Amino acid sequence: MYNKNVAITGSTIEKTTKYDQFREDKIRMELYRIILPLYNEGYRTFTCNPHSYIGLLGADTIIMLREADKCPDITLSAIIPGTTFPADTDKVYRALYDDLMKQADNKEMLPEKEIFSNVLTGSHIVCYYDDFSEEIGQVRASGIPYTNIRKMI
């Protein structure tokens, strides 16, 4: 009952928020509202792609819930692509990424092309994709329950 897992992934920051702080706050609130009930339903391992913006915010939310003792035995698993962040990545997000990688319970490097297929092995998917994107089409076709945060904000 307590070994179910959730994959959190989605678009880049440019496609997600365009660096809009208000939109980022709304995404964080939705992640909190989604992750806490999933944890209470028995999901314990949350796998994030921190190179996707939603994965980075999801990882941060997971750590916050763990530190607040709301989800004491939640596990953060980070899937890291072989590519590095672009040189122009915002320094705040880069620092957040570095901090979260130190706190991740598990880390696995995968080639960029394998990351999305790894997402499709979860018991639930939390994502941020445009309704007409190829990725959301694959999520729908997988039959795995999913929550697309883009529809909530």
Protein language model regions, located:
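Acidic/glycine-enriched connector segments
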Residues: 1-153
